[in-house]
């Protein structure tokens, strides 16, 4: 059970990392997440059931997510459609696209080789190592990218768009690039989770943005004054912590049909804690 919870936390952390690219760096509330996440699962599962190598299927899923990000980016930067509306439009479109890809509302992985099956250990250990390898790879690639001149221009766009433009940075292109990369990472999470769970479903994206945000917020509540690398690692810690919280809710006997409600309550609590701490504990010193 412990290994299973950590495995889920590691893979779901990839979703949090993708959301971090837009929500925290660009200050862009991208609703496309709830479309690109299940889209990644739909593409990977469909290709795997047709005999495609699971690594290639996962790569194709990332490409599909990038296309979803490109669509919302063009609607926002070129079409001048507001952020939330452009995300909702693409998210809604993804639902129909997934039905076209799978030919049905859900599709299972039976008697197929999945990405974690490449490893020679038990199923639980394979899933744990797969999650650890992929989340580490995503963090390293993000750190490498954000340390380049292009990455610094991307960060500057999110920090202060007007100042970035004064330095000759094309902020529209930076936003477009960020949405493409972010949704590619989110689709990767969707592909890995679909393979971990053994199926893809068009409704799998409902509420996943709450899970991703919970990973960010829990990590930020637990840790303060961090470097970029440390912030990315805290997303992983936050994701695993969130999975333990969900497991605790289920273990207490609560109805699992209301899991999305519990998820929203957990996120709301984590968002409220910092403000309550500032309001009631500011300036309070504990006696030795």
Language model features with spans:
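Membrane-interface helix caps of multi-pass small-molecule transporters
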Residues: 21, 46, 50, 70, ...
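Single transmembrane alpha-helix segments in multi-pass membrane proteins
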Residues: 1-53, 58, 75-79, 217-224
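Cytosolic-side transmembrane-helix boundaries in multi-pass membrane proteins
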Residues: 159-166, 170-173, 245-288
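Helix-loop-helix "hairpin" substructures at the membrane interface of multi-pass membrane proteins
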Residues: 68, 124-209, 214
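Transmembrane helix-bundle core of multi-pass membrane transporters
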Residues: 83, 87-90, 94-147, 177, ...
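Transmembrane alpha-helical segments in multi-pass inner-membrane proteins
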Residues: 186, 190, 196-261
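Loop-to-transmembrane alpha-helix initiation sites
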Residues: 8, 84, 127-132, 175, ...
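Alpha-helical transmembrane segments within multi-pass membrane transporters and channels
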Residues: 19, 52-92, 97, 135-136, ...
């Amino acid at each position: 059970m412990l290994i299973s919870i950590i495995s889920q936390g590691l893979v779901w952390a990839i979703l949090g990392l993708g959301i971090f690219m837009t929500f925290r760096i660009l200050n862009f509330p991208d609703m496309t997440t709830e479309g690109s996440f299940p889209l990644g699962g739909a593409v990977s599962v469909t290709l795997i059931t047709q005999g495609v190598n699971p690594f290639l299927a996962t790569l194709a899923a990332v490409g599909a997510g990038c296309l979803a990000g490109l669509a919302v980016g063009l609607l926002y930067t070129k079409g001048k459609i507001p952020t939330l509306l452009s995300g909702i439009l693409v998210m809604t479109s993804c639902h129909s696209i997934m039905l076209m890809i799978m030919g049905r509302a859900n599709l299972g992985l039976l008697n197929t080789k999945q990405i974690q099956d490449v490893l020679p250990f038990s199923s639980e250990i394979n899933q744990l190592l797969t999650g650890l390898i992929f989340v580490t790879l995503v963090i390293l690639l993000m750190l490498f990218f954000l340390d380049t001149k292009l990455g610094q221009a991307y960060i500057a766009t999110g920090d202060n768009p007007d100042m970035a433009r004064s330095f000759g940075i094309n902020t529209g292109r930076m936003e477009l690039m960020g949405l493409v990369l972010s949704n590619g990472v989110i689709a990767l999470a969707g592909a890995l989770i679909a393979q971990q769970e053994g199926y893809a479903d068009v409704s799998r994206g409902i509420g996943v943005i709450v899970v991703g945000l919970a990973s960010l917020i829990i990590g930020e509540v637990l840790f303060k004054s961090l470097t970029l690398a440390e912030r990315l690692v805290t997303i992983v810690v936050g994701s695993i912590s969130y999975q333990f919280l969900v497991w605790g809710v289920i273990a207490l006997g609560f109805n699992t049909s209301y899991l999305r409600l519990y998820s929203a309550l957990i996120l709301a609590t984590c968002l409220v804690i910092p403000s309550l701490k500032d309001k009631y504990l500011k300036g309070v010193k504990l006696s030795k």
